[in-house]
Every structure is written in structure tokens, then in C-alpha cells.
């Protein structure tokens, strides 16, 4: 399948899901997990485009527990925010995120490998997930879903439709 079709499919999925996603907030741990997911997605795309499979594998091995935890926490956010549709929403988000990173990489193809070499070394050497998240923020890693952080004034779950009266 052509990359443009994959991107269009991801964009369509986001357009369908965006209105429902927009009103949902994320707890700080969920927001951090989404940021770590974005960094991992970015590094995966760079690994493929720059033939850095071994470096990516080192990153994943070194931070496996943090990456697994971030994935679970992100899934928990989508289930909490969207109930029964949460798993499908998480899958759509994951697909859209990787497609967006691939499109971004295509735009910067000539500089992608050079510009991300240091990021890879820093990511592999990072001591913990907090440092990885700081790196993602300082490098302005693309995020396709950025819910507001929950406060006492924001809803923590999407509103349920009213039950029909019998």
C-alpha cells in the first residue's frame, strides 16, 4: 500500500475520532505515557528510514519496562475516557501516530538521519522515563493527540449517552 494511502487512512480515522477525543483530559501519568509513546514512534520511524535497527533494539531493551508501562497507561487512558470504544480508539491513535511520524520523516528525509543520531544516543543512555519525556519535549516530538491534563474542573471520562426510558 502506498504511504499516501496509509496517511490518508490515518487522517480519516483521526477526523472521525477527533470530536469525541477533544473533550477528554488525561491524568499527568497518562499524559507522560502519551509523550513517551510519541518518542518511541518517532524513533521507530527513524530506525526504519535510517537503517538503525540495532540502535532501536538497544533503546527498546534498555527501556523495555518503561515503554511497556507507558503503553499500558496510554491504553488505560483510552479505556477510561472512551469506555467500550477505548481499545479501538487507542489502536486508531497508535496507527495515526506512526503514520504522522512517517510523513514528517518523509518531509525531512535529507536531514533525518543526521539530525536524529544524537537523539538516539541520548535515548539509549537516558537513565529513566522522566529523562526520555524531557527529551521528547525539548525536541518537540510530534504528538497527534494532546489531551489537556485533568484538573478538578475538567471531566475525567467522556459523558455517557443518556439511557432510554422504557
Set out the residue ranges of the language-model regions.
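Bacterial N-terminal signal peptides that target proteins for export
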Residues: 1-8
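Intrinsically disordered, low-complexity acidic/Q/S/K-rich activation/interaction tracts characteristic
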Residues: 11-12
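Short N-proximal segments of mature Sec-exported proteins
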Residues: 28-84, 94-100
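Compact alpha-helical subdomains of small soluble proteins
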Residues: 66-165
Amino acid at each position: 500500500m502506498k504511504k499516501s494511502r496509509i496517511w490518508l487512512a490515518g487522517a480519516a480515522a483521526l477526523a472521525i475520532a477527533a470530536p469525541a477525543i477533544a473533550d477528554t483530559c488525561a491524568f499527568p501519568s497518562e499524559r507522560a505515557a502519551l509523550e513517551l509513546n510519541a518518542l518511541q514512534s518517532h524513533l521507530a520511524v527513524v530506525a526504519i528510514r535510517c537503517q538503525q535497527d540495532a540502535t532501536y533494539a538497544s533503546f527498546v531493551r534498555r527501556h523495555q519496562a518503561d515503554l511497556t508501562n507507558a503503553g499500558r497507561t496510554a491504553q488505560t487512558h483510552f479505556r477510561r475516557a472512551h469506555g467500550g470504544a477505548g481499545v479501538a480508539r487507542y489502536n486508531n491513535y497508535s496507527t495515526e501516530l506512526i503514520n504522522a511520524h512517517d510523513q514528517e520523516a518523509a518531509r525531512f528525509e535529507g536531514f533525518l538521519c543526521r539530525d536524529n543520531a544524537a537523539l538516539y544516543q541520548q535515548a539509549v543512555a537516558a537513565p529513566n522515563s522522566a529523562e526520555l519525556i524531557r527529551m521528547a519535549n525539548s525536541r518537540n516530538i510530534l504528538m497527534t493527540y494532546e489531551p489537556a491534563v485533568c484538573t478538578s474542573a475538567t471531566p475525567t471520562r467522556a459523558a455517557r449517552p443518556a439511557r432510554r426510558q422504557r
